[in-house]
């Protein structure tokens, strides 16, 4: 067994900073660990909410972000400023928004228990009802998520609210949806 050692995390971030912006936006720190330790960069904007079966730990290293939450009754924002941390409970619908260029955050979550599904949900910007939910067995953020998003964006039927008939905009949120 190889000897274990620490490394300079700030230097690691600087070395991988080119990946922390669109279109990639994130980089796993450890590939073969029981924790998914991910560094995420801004800017990003998204319109989906994630239903994660495990807790997520957020530590905002550089710049600020907003975590949009839906608790089943109310939509609300939790700003996470540079230097702040936040622990998200399992199954709390959340939409991480990092509007600041060059912002960097650390997200830590456990690998999924056997058989535990993640879900991506989109809600109507007009009436707030669920428009579409896609469940998946998440093993790789990079490989597993893009097909889910592409399928939703490509289907007007999937993007049409069953309650009010409004068509979800897909990838682009309405102007002013994210404020710090």
Curated annotation (Swiss-Prot):
Protein name listed in UniProt: 3-hydroxyanthranilate 3,4-dioxygenase
Binding site for Fe cation 2: 124, 127, 161, 164
Gene Ontology molecular functions: 3-hydroxyanthranilate 3,4-dioxygenase activity; ferrous iron binding
Biological processes annotated in GO: anthranilate metabolic process; L-tryptophan catabolic process; NAD biosynthetic process; quinolinate biosynthetic process
Chain sites annotated for binding Fe cation 1: 50, 56, 94
NCBIfam families attached to this UniProt entry: anthran_nbaC, PRK13264.1
Pathway where this protein functions: Cofactor biosynthesis; NAD(+) biosynthesis; quinolinate from L-kynurenine: step 3/3
One matching Pfam family: 3-HAO
Function of the molecule: Catalyzes the oxidative ring opening of 3-hydroxyanthranilate to 2-amino-3-carboxymuconate semialdehyde, which spontaneously cyclizes to quinolinate.
Cofactor field: Fe(2+)
Binding site for substrate: 56, 98, 109
Catalysis performed (reactions): 3-hydroxyanthranilate + O2 = (2Z,4Z)-2-amino-3-carboxymuconate 6-semialdehyde
Organism of origin: Jannaschia sp. (strain CCS1)
The organism's place on the tree of life at top rank: Bacteria
């Amino acid at each position: 067994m190889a000897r274990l050692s620490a490394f300079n995390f700030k230097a690691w971030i600087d070395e991988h900073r080119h990946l922390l912006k669109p279109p990639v936006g994130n980089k796993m720190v450890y590939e073969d660990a029981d924790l998914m330790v991910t560094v995420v960069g801004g800017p990003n904007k998204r319109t989906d909410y994630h239903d994660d079966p495990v807790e997520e730990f957020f530590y905002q290293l550089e710049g600020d972000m907003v975590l949009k939450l839906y608790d089943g009754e109310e939509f609300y924002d939790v700003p996470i400023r540079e230097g702040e941390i936040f622990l998200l409970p399992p199954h709390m619908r959340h939409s991480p928004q990092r509007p600041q260029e060059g912002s960097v955050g650390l997200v830590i979550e456990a690998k999924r228990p056997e058989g535990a599904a993640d879900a991506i949900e989109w809600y109507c910007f007009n009436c707030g009802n669920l428009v579409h939910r896609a469940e998946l067995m998440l093993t790789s953020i990079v490989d597993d998520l893009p097909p889910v998003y592409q399928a939703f964006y490509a289907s007007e039927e999937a993007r049409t609210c069953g309650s009010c008939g409004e068509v979800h905009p897909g990838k682009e949120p309405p102007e002013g949806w994210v404020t710090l």
